[in-house]
Amino acid sequence: MATLQAIKYSRGKLLVLDQLRLPHENHYDEVSTAEEAFDCIRSMRVRGAPAIAIVAALAHAVELHNGDCTATEPEEVIAHIEKRLDYLKESRPTAVDLSNAITLLKLATRAANLEGLAHPEAKEAILNTYIQTAEEILAKDLHNNTSIGSYGTAWLQQQYSASSEKPISVLTHCNTGSLATSGHGTALGIIRTLHSEGLLKHAYCTETRPYNQGSRLTSFELVFEGIPSTLITDSMAGALFNLHRERMNIGAVIVGADRVVRNGDTANKIGTYQLAVLARHHGVKFVVAAPTTSIDLETGNGSAIEIEERKREELTQISGAIVNEDGTVDTSKTARVAIADQRIGVWNPAFDVTPHELIDAIVTERGTVVKGADGKFDFSQVLPERLASVAARQL
């Protein structure tokens, strides 16, 4: 089955799908510098925690491959790389994948084997180490997403005895598919796997105001791949559970994550928290799908997560392609219109934090983590080394 690609990469060239033009136009921007990557991420032409990290890492790989670094001394080369990475880190501070990728790239670059090399060869070794590490981040993400899909499907099948005769329906929020990752997706990856195994009855997606990632992107992916699906507004979720849970066998809300902290509190797209509350009230499982790169063991709980706030116009204005009188869409014309009094005060956090108490399972590429008898998530089964390292530093 054909899938969408948000990122197209070959060494020395990076193309990023402009998701602001979807679903009406498929247009790829060439991203050749850290500045272009920063703007691409900040403007949300690319979004989704894994995709953000990949674009940042590969953009700098492209500029290094194409001769951006003029330094010759090994320490100066490393300093140049780290300065560019620190700049890119500020493009989306809530997404921990970006921070983790930058840490990995810095460590790998400093660990490059320079023994017996003169300065020109040492510089080349450092650059090659960076580029190869960035390319490995891309390849690993796709593998991880496929594993998340398998683990999540297995857990849901076990919870509901799902089968082709008794498929389940699910609700998802924001966009967590091929457009938010290197491919397949996290939460949407589980939905894809459920569908491919004949275990999915129906997928519901929220529009995800104010940026409409659900209506613009997730619905586009679901239709593109022929997955039975329905779009609802964010405010319809409670009514959906109340009126259709039994008839449609709605078993789970499946969401992604921009950051999961040590106790399981999860930062994700604004609106996630209220879905968790509704799911708990109606007896629907609430599942977070995230690679281990999105897990932040350094932060104890969600109160310490920095929440990005975005511009007021995202709530008071909206843009899109022109709809003709006969109902056809003219993608060559767009308009931006006001949908609120422009004088109204606006609060526009991009994310909220769902308390771990409302989460039933966190699905990673290494397995599904559930709460123990004490009501707490234990990440030792999927991140034993990182957890031990954090614990040792706290002694």
UniProtKB/Swiss-Prot annotation:
UniProt keyword Nucleus present: yes
Top-level taxon of origin: Eukaryota
Active site: D258 (proton donor)
Pfam families: IF-2B
The reaction(s) this protein catalyses: 5-(methylsulfanyl)-alpha-D-ribose 1-phosphate = 5-(methylsulfanyl)-D-ribulose 1-phosphate
GO BP: L-methionine salvage from methylthioadenosine
Matches recorded under InterPro entries: IF-2B-related, IF-M1Pi, IF_2B-like_C, Initiation_fac_2B_a/b/d, M1Pi_N, NagB/RpiA_transferase-like
EC number: 5.3.1.23
Keyword annotations: Amino-acid biosynthesis, Cytoplasm, Isomerase, Methionine biosynthesis, Nucleus
Subcellular location: Cytoplasm; Nucleus
Pathway(s) the chain acts in: Amino-acid biosynthesis; L-methionine biosynthesis via salvage pathway; L-methionine from S-methyl-5-thio-alpha-D-ribose 1-phosphate: step 1/6
Signal peptide: none
Gene Ontology cellular component terms for the protein in this record: cytoplasm; nucleus
Site residues by UniProt (Transition state stabilizer): C174
Keyword Isomerase annotated: yes
GO molecular function: S-methyl-5-thioribose-1-phosphate isomerase activity
Biological role stated in the UniProt entry: Catalyzes the interconversion of methylthioribose-1-phosphate (MTR-1-P) into methylthioribulose-1-phosphate (MTRu-1-P).
Family membership noted in the UniProt record: Belongs to the eIF-2B alpha/beta/delta subunits family. MtnA subfamily.
PANTHER family in UniProt: METHYLTHIORIBOSE-1-PHOSPHATE ISOMERASE
Name of this chain's protein: Methylthioribose-1-phosphate isomerase
Protein source organism: Podospora anserina (strain S / ATCC MYA-4624 / DSM 980 / FGSC 10383)
Organism taxonomic ancestry: Eukaryota, Fungi, Dikarya, Ascomycota, Pezizomycotina
Gene: MRI1
